[in-house]
Curated annotation (Swiss-Prot):
Catalyzes the transfer of an acyl group from acyl-phosphate (acyl-PO(4)) to glycerol-3-phosphate (G3P) to form lysophosphatidic acid (LPA). This enzyme utilizes acyl-phosphate as fatty acyl donor, but not acyl-CoA or acyl-ACP. One of its GO terms (biological process) is phospholipid biosynthetic process. It comes from the Bacteria. The keyword Lipoprotein does not apply. Its EC number is 2.3.1.275. It is a multi-pass membrane protein. This is Glycerol-3-phosphate acyltransferase. GO terms for cellular component: plasma membrane. PANTHER family: GLYCEROL-3-PHOSPHATE ACYLTRANSFERASE-RELATED, INNER MEMBRANE PROTEIN YGIH. Probably interacts with PlsX. One of its GO terms (molecular function) is acyl-phosphate glycerol-3-phosphate acyltransferase activity.
Length: 198
């Protein structure tokens, strides 16, 4: 097996590391899997521990998607393998082997993957999130909007079928992981950014 193929399991294992759990334990915060929304992600950590903890979680989760792709770029892997490596990191965050396959929703890790595909694509997705969040104050709605538009951004900027397909699958999984949020949005019960979830 060519050594570059080992980047797929490496990306998955790195994705399986929970930044939210590590940051929360380090800072003496409640376990985000047990408190708040019970999602080990930056938004829940923001509610439980404030901005510093949330930023550290966001950077950690995004790095999980970015680092394997930076390594892959340095090895000049093929486009299909490059796409698979990014997708593996994302899946690792959603279904982590270290946490009984119960992970987060994948927003920050998906951002890291998109930045790894091409930084302008990641930037466009991030600006989409920021714009929707500024208008509506819902983290989940912002993530859903960015997820829907991400494959379009990849196609327009890169034109790579492999990367578009990988991004489509990431987007579908991300929307699926937000099904509870979608239900609450439709009922008018979703917590806004800055609100404490009881």
């Amino acid at each position: 097996m060519p050594v570059e193929w080992l980047l797929i399991p490496f990306a998955y294992l790195l994705g399986s590391v929970s930044s939210a759990v590590i940051v929360s334990r380090t800072l003496g915060l409640p376990d985000p899997r047990q408190e708040g929304s019970k999602n080990p992600g930056a938004t829940n950590v923001l509610r439980l521990g404030g901005k510093r903890a949330a930023i550290l979680t966001l950077l950690g989760d995004a790095s999980k998607g970015l680092i394997p792709l930076l390594i892959a770029k340095s090895m000049a892997v093929s486009p299909p393998l490059f796409a698979a490596i990014g997708f593996a990191a994302f899946v690792g965050h959603l279904y982590p082997v270290f946490f009984q396959f119960k992970g987060g929703k994948g927003v920050a890790t998906a951002l890291g993957v998109l930045l790894g595909f091409a930084w302008p694509v990641g930037l466009m997705a991030l600006l989409t999130w920021i714009g929707v969040a500024a208008l509506f104050r819902f983290s989940s709605l912002s993530a859903l909007a960015a997820a829907v538009l991400a494959p379009v951004y990849v196609w327009l900027w890169l034109g790579s079928a492999e990367l578009v397909v990988a991004t489509l699958f990431m987007s579908m999984l991300l929307v699926y992981r937000h099904k509870g949020n979608i239900e609450r949005l439709l009922k008018g019960e979703e917590a806004r950014l800055g609100a404490k979830r009881l």
